[in-house]
């Protein structure tokens, strides 16, 4: 095949073909657009410092009542009755037997009011150990809120003073609200906005926001874009990494076309960003190669020699979240060669929309979450960065406390877990919700909006703001201007250390992270 002399029509054909071939790498759409990556960040990481946030998104809506399970006798008995359990604290319906929860009982430093107690799902023994050893915390009853809200205000009609989050109970919209504070269609997330501020702290800005689970609005910023990577490594651009149509000559021709300067602005921009994407893939591949080659060897804690040993457990076989977190650990190990001082990662686990088969389905999910997250935490210890890497869970929404027979339905508020040595661990944060599903004027019925769907007493903005402050985002106003934190989380101003009409306090910083 003769390809060394190409007229303009042929060049266009090859360029179009190279676009089609390149886009077979799923990461390319977000990898290619590197525009504005050199924008100055609003904060600068101190020399030698490193911090990373890892968002673990549980797609489908995590069942709060069987994840962080109420344990004190009065609350447990109410839970057991509502969820179809038997008498005398035995299992039944979709309730756990109390005896099954004893090994995962959480022992906080500060007891909860009214002697409330919680245990984690029986499969979460590793996370129980992390909590009881001060390496994890539980934030109670979080969900999207625009302003502090009571049940009376929720049921009322004054949406000017008490606006509701849009499209409650909808998967796509609530996923987007959690990740961006806006419903489906939002283009910018709070993880990406943190990345915007951190760009100039990193010498290679493209590695600021990295997803190991495909595209998400969470990592999209105004300037920062999500670099997508697979669990096997950087996604190669096919037409320049291997022969095309079995021909090395075609590959060479396309490579030349992609590197030539063009007079047409779109062709030239395509060449520039594709060349940068090729370079980025090469950097990622070489940076993680050493650790990847030596996985599980020995027991030393230097990168690449036993560092990733926790991920070799047979218990992690087939665990997609573990594979994602293993890649995150490899990237963190390569942080110096990637020029990174601040990074935000996004991983996920699906299968939480359990309208039926809740007990079996959630057992699989919680086993995978427990095993993956504990392996990842231990790997950060091995890397010497456990106090510099914070992982946290998020999900579409919580679910109903009532059973629909074999599962639970879409809800609102939920409980979430934060892990890392920078966490003020062995504590519960927020307000423990009453265990009730009835609709009366009793105080116990004021914090659900029907069937035990929790009305959040902590907003996602407070949760995000606490994480962002530790990450280095400035929470303070300068010369009367809006603070960095309020810029990326506009609704946070509505939770600025205020006491709601219910008497519940909404702190700007929830306190579960150490000072930055």
Give the predicted meaning of each segment:
Residues 342-344, 386, 394, 411-414:
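Active-site lining segments that contact anionic ligands and/or coordinate catalytic metals
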Residues 395-428:
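Histidine-centered active-site microenvironments of extracellular/periplasmic hydrolases
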Residues 2-371, 375-382, 427-516:
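Feature for exported/extracytoplasmic and membrane-associated proteins, marking the mature portion
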Residues 373, 380-405:
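Metal-dependent active-site segment of extracytoplasmic phospho-/sulfohydrolases and closely related
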Residues 348-350, 392-394, 419:
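Generic beta-strand/beta-sheet core signal
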């Amino acid at each position: 095949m003769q390809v060394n002399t190409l007229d303009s029509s042929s060049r266009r054909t090859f360029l179009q073909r190279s676009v089609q071939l390149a886009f077979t790498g799923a990461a390319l759409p977000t990898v290619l657009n590197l525009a504005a990556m050199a924008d100055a960040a609003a904060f600068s990481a101190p020399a030698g410092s490193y911090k990373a946030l890892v968002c673990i998104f549980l797609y489908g809506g995590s069942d709060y009542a069987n994840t962080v399970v109420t344990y004190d006798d009065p609350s447990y008995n109410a839970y057991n009755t509502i969820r179809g359990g038997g008498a005398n604290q035995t299992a039944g319906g979709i309730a756990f037997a109390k005896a099954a929860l004893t090994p995962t009982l959480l022992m906080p430093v500060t007891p909860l009011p009214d002697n409330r107690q919680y245990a984690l799902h029986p499969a979460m023994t590793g996370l129980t150990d992390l909590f009881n050893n001060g390496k994890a915390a539980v934030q109670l009853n979080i969900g999207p809120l625009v302003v502090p809200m009571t049940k009376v205000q929720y049921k009322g009609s004054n949406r000017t003073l008490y606006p509701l989050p849009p499209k409650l109970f909808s998967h796509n919209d609530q996923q987007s609200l959690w990740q961006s504070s806006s419903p489906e269609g939002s283009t910018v997330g709070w993880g990406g906005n943190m990345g915007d501020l951190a760009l100039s702290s990193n010498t290679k800005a493209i590695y600021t926001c990295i997803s190991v689970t495909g595209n998400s609005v969470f990592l999209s910023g105004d300037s920062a874009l999500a670099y997508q990577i697979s669990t096997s490594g950087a996604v190669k651009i096919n037409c320049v990494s291997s022969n095309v149509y079995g021909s090395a000559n075609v590959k060479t021709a396309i490579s030349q076309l992609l590197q030539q300067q063009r007079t047409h602005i779109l062709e030239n921009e395509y060449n520039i960003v594709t060349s940068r994407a090729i370079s980025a893939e090469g950097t990622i591949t070489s940076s993680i190669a050493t650790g990847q080659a030596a996985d599980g060897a020995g027991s030393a804690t230097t990168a690449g020699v036993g560092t990733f040993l926790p991920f070799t457990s047979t218990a992690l076989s087939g665990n997609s979240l573990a594979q994602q977190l293993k890649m995150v650990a490899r990237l963190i190990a390569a942080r110096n060669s990637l020029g990174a001082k601040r990074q935000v990662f996004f991983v996920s686990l699906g299968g939480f929309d359990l309208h039926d088969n809740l007990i079996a389905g959630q057992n699989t999910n919680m086993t995978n979450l427990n095993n993956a997250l504990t392996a990842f935490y231990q790997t950060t210890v091995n890397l010497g960065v456990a106090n510099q890497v914070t992982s946290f869970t998020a999900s579409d929404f919580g679910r109903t406390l009532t059973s629909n027979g074999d599962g639970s339905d879409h809800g609102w508020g939920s409980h979430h877990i934060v892990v890392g040595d920078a966490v003020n661990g062995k504590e519960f944060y927020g307000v423990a919700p009453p265990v009730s599903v009835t609709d009366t004027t009793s105080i116990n019925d004021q914090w659900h909006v029907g069937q035990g769907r929790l009305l959040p007493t902590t907003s996602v903005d407070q949760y995000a703001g606490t994480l962002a402050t530790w990450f280095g985002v400035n929470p303070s106003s300068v010369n009367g201007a809006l603070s960095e934190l309020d810029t990326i989380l506009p609704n946070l101003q509505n939770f600025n250390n205020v006491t709601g009409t219910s008497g519940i306090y909404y702190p700007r910083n929830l306190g579960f992270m150490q000072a930055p």
